[in-house]
Amino acid sequence: MEFLSENPDVDVSAAWERCWGIQTKIIERVKARYDVKRHPSCDGREYFVSDEHEVHGKMEGSFNSYTGDEVDWLVHSWIGNRQKSILDINATVFLGQMNQVPHLTIIFGTIPRLYFYAEYTPRMDLRTNPDYVSKYYEPVNQDFLEFRANQDWTRFVSHGTYLRSLMSPICVSSHAELNDTNIDYCEDYLEKFIQRWFDWLDEAEELPIERRDQQQKYDYAVRELGYRNATMYILPIRVF
């Protein structure tokens, strides 16, 4: 957040439009594949705005959540102030228990540097399941290393130990100058990243019925703890 304190009044509206649009295409593709319904928790939150905050001004945002038989939790949301540098834009897909394909998380942010996060959230402990690592993470390793080697981008390391523990070996969490070239780079990276995920869904083996309850407990715990420990979780609490 040191970047934000140094540049608190940058208009990031154009970046919001592009990043929200990139995520919208992903969310619409998920909605086209799975039968999901809007969750009551997002009623009245398609667009919201706060009272004036002494530091961040008026915060605004949108919260859109969906659920279905094959998707436990699908969220497309953002919060921030487009005239005061800060944005947190999220697209998250927590799958149901019909298989063990990793969940999907794509985040854009502005601080006001561009922040980018792309992750296949594991469905089990990777330390004790090397076959799962080989199946879902080893094929992504080269792309991850190439992204990390890009001199325009700097690896973003969370101050929170729990959040760092959530990251898989191929999790992209990086920041760069806020410009169209770097947003283009993220968009290009996501084309392959998202298509690979959908290919996994097409090829996935069904998880036996008797293992699904335990998988659901694991998935829910990861989701809840991830949200509660998220760095930006404090922002709406402070403002609202």
Walk through the language-model features, giving the residues of each.
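Extended, charge-biased low-complexity segments
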Residues: E70, L74-D143
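Mixed-charge (acidic/basic) macromolecular-recognition segments
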Residues: Y117-T231
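Generic secondary-structure transition motif, activating predominantly at the C-termini of alpha-helices
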Residues: V30-R38, T67, I79, N99, ...
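Polar low-complexity intrinsically disordered regions
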Residues: M1-E6, Q216, F240
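Extended amphipathic alpha-helical scaffold segments
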Residues: Y233-F240
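Alpha-helical structural elements
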Residues: D11, A15, R29, C42-D43, ...
